[in-house]
Amino acid sequence: MNLIILGSGSPLPDPNRAGPATLVRTASGDLLFDCGRGVLMRAAAAGSAAGAVRTLFLTHLHSDHTTDLNDIITMRWATSFAPNQLEVVGPVGTTALVEATETMLATDIGYRLTHHDDLTWSPASVVTEVESGVVMDVGGVLVTAAPTDHAPVRPTVGFRIDEGGRAVVVAGDTVPCAGLDDLCVGADVLVHTVVRRDLIEGIGLPRLLDVLDYHSSVEDAARTAARAGVDTLVLTHMVPAPSPGTEQEWLDLAAAHFSGEVVLAEDLTTLDLPRP
C-alpha cells in the first residue's frame, strides 16, 4: 500500500498547496479520499489520473473537499474509450451533490457528445451513501467507515483502509470523537486535518475563530493518535498554513502528546507501507 497526500491545503487558496485530497494506491486500484482544488494536477504528478481512480470517497460535503468533483467526472468520462462509471462513496447528501454536479455539466457533456463520434455515452456516477461499517471489500482491500464530529456539518465520516496487514485512516475534518478513536485502533498511519489554535486566537477574526469549534488542533490530533497507538501521524489541511521556518513548531506541538512519527504534509508527501 502506498499513501500520497495530493493536496495538503485548506479552504484558503495557497500557491503551494492543493485542496484536501489523499490517494491510497492498493493492489485493487487507486482510492481517492476527497477532491479539493487542483487534485488532478497533483494526481498527474503522482502518476495517477481520473481514469485510474477506482473509487472516490468523500469524508463530508464542504466545498473545499469537493471542489474538483466536476473535473474528475469530466476527465474520467472524456478520456475513457468505454463506459467507465465513477464510484463515489460518501455520507448522506452525496447523491444529491453528484447529481447536481452532473446536471451542471450537462451543457459541456452535450458539446462533447456532439463533437466526438466515438463518445456515445454520458457520465453516470454510481453513488453509495454510508454512515458506518464496511463500505468496500475487494481483492484483499477493506475500507471501513465510521461517523466523525464536524458539527454543525452533518453527517461526516472517516475511512480506514486495510490491506496486507497494514492500515491507514483518513479522518477528514473532525474534533476528537469515539467514532474516529474506534477507526484508528491498531492503524499504522492516521492522516488528520488540523488547525493551530494558538495562531488563530492570536489573529482574532470572528470568522476564523469559528473554525476552532469543529476542527481538531494539532494537540487534539496527537492525542487521538496516542490513544489509538498508531505509528505515524500525518498532519494536513493546516490552518493557517505553516510559514517557512515554523515547521518545527507544529511538530513539537504534536510530539508533546504523541511519541510516534509525526509528518507535516506537503503536496505529494508519500509514505510506503510494505506488507509486514
Walk through the language-model features, giving the residues of each:
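Binuclear metal-dependent hydrolase catalytic cores
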Residues: 1-169, 251-276
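Cap/insert and terminal regions of metallo-dependent hydrolase folds
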Residues: 158, 167, 175-268
